[in-house]
Amino acid sequence: MEHGLSRINLEMGVSDGKVDWFVVQLEQNVGQRYGKRDWRQVTRSDHHPDSAWGHDVEAERLHLDLYRDGQKVDVQRGFPPVSAENAPAYCERFFEKSAGNLLERYGPRSE
């Protein structure tokens, strides 16, 4: 990952010391590297057990939604069991390790 070109974005909700929800995204900048940036999601993993559109990583396991040009194009499954508390860190490590391949395969295309 290169500063200004790609990043990992993590958001989570915690109550009583437990993770209620999270979203971890690998994002790529299609704007300026040192000016106005335009971040696009490349891959996303989330845990929203109380949402109609979400899912529970403890019941369903982690999966990655893979995007290209703002459209979901694939889903990667087959991850090991992980608790909601450990899943955000697991996703960050996975994205750090796999960023090059994921960005090359699913990142926004140059015009």
Locations of regions flagged by a protein language model:
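Negatively charged, low-complexity tracts enriched in Asp/Glu with abundant Ser/Thr
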Residues: 1-41
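Intrinsically disordered, low-complexity segments enriched in small/polar residues
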Residues: 2, 11, 15, 33, ...
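Alpha-helical structural elements
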Residues: 16-17, 34, 48, 62, ...
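Acidic, aromatic-enriched beta-alpha/helix-loop junctions
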Residues: 25-66
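Acidic, low-complexity intrinsically disordered segments
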Residues: 59-110
